[in-house]
């Protein structure tokens, strides 16, 4: 009886661990778009904004092709990158990937970049990040 209880506990723990692992694995690869309507006086008409944040260097397809396609589908008037696009421990390759993403997004709509805590920590070792972001086509909001 004791052995059967032990086997049930091990099986339950294994199922829970596997479920959590799969949720994290597939959740990190999924792109979703949420729509919100906000009414602002004196705006002069509807404006579509895409807000991206907390990618932490994650890539969605080769050169972010899936992410870029999803953003193009939204036909935005502006794109806001709201921090933590890279990790605090990013290497030059991660930064170049971010800059390529900004260049591609800039072809779709104006891009606005606000650094998050990870960018701010990264800039303690590479102070040129915001200059590079601006040169890639984003307006830096700091």
What are these regions (language model features)?
Residues 8-11, 20-24, 51-53, 84-85, ...:
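N-terminal start-of-chain detector that recognizes signal peptides
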